[in-house]
Amino acid sequence: LFGELNKVSLREIWPHEASDFTPWLAENIGELGKALGMDLELTEQEASVGDFSLDILAKDLGSSKSVIIENQLTQTNHDHLGKLLTYAAGFNASIVIWVSEAIREEHRQALDWLNQRTDTETSFFGVVVEVIKIDDSKPAFNFKLAASPNEWQKQKNRQTPRGSVSTKGEKYKNYFQSLIDDLRNNHKFTSAKAGQPQNWYSFSSGSSGITYGANFSQEGKARAELYIGLSDREKNKYIFDELEKIKEEIESSLGEEISWERLDNGIASRLALYTDGSIDDSDSELESVKAWHIEKLLKLKSTLGSKIKPLFNVAKSM
């Protein structure tokens, strides 16, 4: 009736950590993000820290926090724990992730201790990656969370009032928590799970540096956008200009006009949609804004999703 479930050695799939596993993990960073409840975006592979190289430098799009990922194809060891802390300090990381085949109990305890002793802005995660097969099936991978922050304990240890969130910040956090929960549970739009006390939230497009965003601007407007924010100005303007060449096609598909914001005085560019809305609106008005944000984000993704990747690939080679 049932097949036999078998674990596969990681080295059968990825013989070499640096040349096989790290590139695969970088390419599948979104899957790791799902296991952690984050939208992770790759920043750099083999990022230099003095004479050493971090496996993966990334960003949590929901909070813009820096993320470091150190991985190994074997059980955790003291050498990699030392590297993990060195890289965390070198990049001033807020989110520290250790991926391995197995996590020794003393190393899990070390991660728990670090989570208990650090502030609410710093989080340490231990993640086990496993590969499984059923009989002679194709191998499948799975990420299992082995160590993570105890948010209740971190909240308890938070210093007040210096560490407290403003009333408006709490409103933003509650709004975006509701928004991302809806987008995740009902539309599979994001893996994010934690709202932030800020007036914006970004979501992965699948191309590093290009994101979908939901925002509240200072002019009493709510905005849904495609944000083109690579580190290179020329590449951003190229992507924007190429999209603008098919403006009529894009706007016809969306069913409305877009605000085309090249932002010539800045590095980034964006395509935006606006409606009236403020975080200080009534609960019923904010529900309407949330419904608008969801509708427009889904439309932007369905209209622009297939167009972004080819332009991103060309821009990368420029």
Model-predicted regions and their roles:
Residues L1-M318:
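Charged, terminal alpha-helix-loop-beta segments
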